[in-house]
């Protein structure tokens, strides 16, 4: 059994027991979260939502929150001497999928 959920502007294919990184949710570790935007549900039979599957949700437990590795953004224009260096670390929340409610 698997489901495709949408959170943080991205889509994730999840099954029970999976651990995934999603965009920061702002919830402390150990808390339970529910994802209600289930786009596709497969429990032996594929159900595609329009745009979401009615009555379906995915419950998960927050494992940790953190930041990804730093990404360096470097802008450069030749001949003029212009250059600019920026760094960015995106925050994430790691969750463990507990149950897919159909």
From Swiss-Prot:
Transmembrane segments: none annotated. It comes from the Bacteria. GO terms for cellular component: cytoplasm; ribonucleoprotein complex; ribosome. Coiled coil: none annotated. It holds the Pfam family Ribosomal_L21p. InterPro entries: bL21-like, bL21-like_sf, Ribosomal_bL21. GO terms for biological process: translation. One of its GO terms (molecular function) is rRNA binding. Keywords: Ribonucleoprotein, Ribosomal protein, RNA-binding, rRNA-binding. Belongs to the bacterial ribosomal protein bL21 family. This protein binds to 23S rRNA in the presence of protein L20. Part of the 50S ribosomal subunit. Contacts protein L20. This is Large ribosomal subunit protein bL21. It comes from Lachnoclostridium phytofermentans (strain ATCC 700394 / DSM 18823 / ISDg).
């Amino acid at each position: 059994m698997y489901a495709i959920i949408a959170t943080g502007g991205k889509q994730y294919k999840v099954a029970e027991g999976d651990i995934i990184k999603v965009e920061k949710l702002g919830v402390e570790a150990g808390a339970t979260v529910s994802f209600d935007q289930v786009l596709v549900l497969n429990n032996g039979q594929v159900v595609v939502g329009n745009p979401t599957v009615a009555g379906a949700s995915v419950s998960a437990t927050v494992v940790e929150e953190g930041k990804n590795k730093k990404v360096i953004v470097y802008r450069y224009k030749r001949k003029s001497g212009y250059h600019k260096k920026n760094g960015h670390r995106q925050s994430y929340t790691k969750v463990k999928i507990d149950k897919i409610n159909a």
